[in-house]
Amino acid sequence: GLFALLQFPMTIMVGYRRAQTEIPFLDGGDATLLRRMRAHGNFVETVPMVLLAMAFAEWNGLPPSWLWAGGLCLLAGRLLHAWWTLEHAWGVPRAFGMVLTFLPMLGFGGWTFYKGLV
């Protein structure tokens, strides 16, 4: 539920900018719209798969402390990445946000893959 609540304002921000600029499709060369689209798009491209991997990891017996740690990494990573992407094109905080997203993606995915082998 929390990640759905995080996605909602990003969706609204894209729609609002589209209304302001009267750009119905793509980014029309508007840098602000492009940043908003990419912040939203990157969220949609990563969060569902990590949450699915998290659910499978839980189902396969990953201890709750690891689930919480991975979930908090994902939350922090998505907040940091979205905040920085909306304000700047590139930077260390944005990259760190992706690292915090990749850690649970690899951890939950790796655990689930391992448990499928044994």
What do these predicted regions represent?
Residues 32, 36-42, 58, 62-65, ...:
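Juxtamembrane loop-transmembrane helix junctions in multi-pass integral membrane proteins
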Residues 41-54, 105:
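Core segments of transmembrane alpha-helices
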Residues 50-53, 57-86:
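Mid-chain, well-packed structural core segment of small domains
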Residues 80-106:
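Interfacial loop-to-transmembrane junctions
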Residues 110-118:
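Juxtamembrane boundary at the C-terminal end of a transmembrane helix
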